[in-house]
Amino acid sequence: MPRIDISRLPDESRIWIFGISPALDKPKSLRLLSLVDRFLDDWSAHGQAIVSARDLLHGSFLVIAVDQQSETSGCSIDRMFGLLRQLESELGVVILDPNRIFYQDGSGKVATMTRPEFVENGRQDMVVFDILAERIGRIRRGLWQKPARDSWHGALIRQAS
């Protein structure tokens, strides 16, 4: 079976993190995970099953991970993005918006701003989520959550100064 529990993947495993806005409630979370599981169970590249896993963090971040021994292809990645477009439509959420910045608000909840809003209102001490992280080990070590000043997000704020 190509889909495994994400905890079984090594830290070097390739990941894609997709921010979801608004955050999913329990029924939508379950629906999303069901559709993603079905996709991952059949995901392949050049006829070879892709050993993969998924997780949903904070109800706002879909993580898709691939074992480093599996090879993806342009077509297999395109199919993954097709799934994401389907999820957006079916669940009434935004997943593929590159202009969304995800951060932790004052109460510790995940919130979003557009990139222009972040340039205007972001602060260097805001905890942001780096959805560009490429290895699962970065999530496990908490390196994808950090103050904006320690991330590429800080440069957006500096540009506005």
Describe every region a protein language model picked out.
Residues I4, D11-L56:
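Long, hydrophobic N-terminal alpha-helical segment
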Residues A49-V66, S70:
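Short, intrinsically disordered low-complexity segments
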Residues I64-I95:
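Helix-adjacent hinge/juxtasegments
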Residues L35, F39, E90, N121:
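Residues that form generic nucleotide/phosphate-binding pockets
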